[in-house]
Amino acid sequence: EFKQAEDAIARAEQDRLFMLLMSGRKQVIKTGQINGVPFKVKIDSLLDGDICREIVKEFPKTADTFGFCDGAIVDEKYVRDINPVWKSRIGWVPFVEAWGYDLQGAIYQRIDDRYLPFLLAAITKESPARIAALTVEQPDLDAKIIEVEELAPYYQSIKEGKTEPTRCGVCEYCRQTEVLDDIINYKILGVEERDE
């Protein structure tokens, strides 16, 4: 896996646009509140206006993404692949939505408080690695921040131990706290709750 990661990094380093996206201020920590709930974010690459203009000059097709912005928030993702993900109750979903990166972008954007474009610099774990520069459109971020505003107090209540979480059966918390109370047929394992 170390060799695979090295190969993926080498692949990304060969691409000028990818490297420009990752050339901003690194690991910028910001704190703030959403609906009275504290949040802390760590931005992988915070681009300033000069870097954005340099990108648009070298890569004119990016002009629609950057517009006249004063910067951009870039999050680097090292992922299995960038293909749509099957969600049993929904169907095929873009990987960005399946793994909540759009929600993450909405939080980052709100905490940064400048509403800069939110971009993903994705590298896959495939061999050879695939790279992608992706944007999450503002209407999608706006919809997600409404979701965060509505749910933040509930999650804060869970975090403080005041509310018992609703179990989904598949998340990290559920796997860690699972208690067996039945024996099930292997053929139905995960049919209802599993999303892949």
Residue spans of the language-model regions?
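Metal-dependent nuclease catalytic cores that hydrolyze phosphodiester bonds in DNA/RNA
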Residues: 1-43, 166-172
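Sequence-level motif detector for i,i+2 pairs with an aromatic at +2
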Residues: 21-23, 69-71, 115
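Short, mixed charged/polar active-site loops
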Residues: 38-40, 69-71, 129-133
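Metal-dependent nuclease catalytic regions and adjoining charged, substrate-binding loops involved
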Residues: 95-196
